[in-house]
Amino acid sequence: MDARIFQDNDDTSLPVNQASVTRIHKKPGKAEAEAAVRTLLLWVGEDPDREGLLETPKRVAKAYQELFGGYSGSPEEVLGTTFEEVAGYDDMVLVKDISFFSHCEHHMVPIIGKAHVAYLPEGRVVGLSKIARVVDIFARRLQTQESITAQIADSIQRILKPRGVAVMIEAEHMCMAMRSIRKQGSSTITTTFTGDFKEKADQQVRFMTLIRT
């Protein structure tokens, strides 16, 4: 049976009311976050009281709630609803070209790229948008690309229990493009395989081939 391929170009914004991850430190309030932004403006040499920056602390705090919305996301909730009546389909399900953004945990500057995610169902499949939502849950945090890749694969494997999961991420890191060596246009590729994708080379080849199709 031929594998099904799906291309995702839709906006997959996360709901903001999902279960929070465990935090070691008490979460500061909105006023404290805005005060921190004001401090940074002063530190870089700006005047936070000039007209163009008066609302900036509020805007930045609000933007960060969206940009880092992954901390309030739960892959268990997203992948909790599955479909078992899939007419016996048990071949690869691949959702490719899932656009995402993240932020480097070292410098807090953007990582921009796309993810390709495949799994081999074991009697259960999920709605295609759910895969993209899982990508966003882990991407919208302070991250490394290696961690995002592994976390996506691990959550799908752990929750859906398929015969295998394959994840490839291609991304450009602004910490390389905007600072230090300043190499614009360079990309980083990371992969994680579980189950049949890890144990069977032909499944990896199929995955890679379908991504490039």
Curated annotation (Swiss-Prot):
Enzyme class: hydrolase
Residues the entry annotates as binding Zn(2+): 104, 107, 175
Alphabetized UniProt keyword annotations: GTP-binding, Hydrolase, Metal-binding, Nucleotide-binding, One-carbon metabolism, Zinc
Pathway(s) per entry: Cofactor biosynthesis; 7,8-dihydroneopterin triphosphate biosynthesis; 7,8-dihydroneopterin triphosphate from GTP: step 1/1
Superkingdom in the source lineage: Bacteria
GO biological process, one term: tetrahydrobiopterin biosynthetic process
Reaction(s) this enzyme catalyzes, per UniProt: GTP + H2O = 7,8-dihydroneopterin 3'-triphosphate + formate + H(+)
GO molecular function, one term: GTP binding
Matches recorded under SUPFAM superfamilies: Tetrahydrobiopterin biosynthesis enzymes-like
GO cellular component, one term: cytoplasm
Enzyme Commission code(s) on record: 3.5.4.16
Subunit: Toroid-shaped homodecamer, composed of two pentamers of five dimers.
NCBIfam families: folE (TIGR00063), PRK09347.1-2 (NF006825), PRK09347.1-3 (NF006826)
Family: Belongs to the GTP cyclohydrolase I family.
PANTHER family: GTP CYCLOHYDROLASE 1 (PTHR11109:SF7), GTP CYCLOHYDROLASE I (PTHR11109)
Name used for this protein in its record: GTP cyclohydrolase 1
Gene it is expressed from: folE
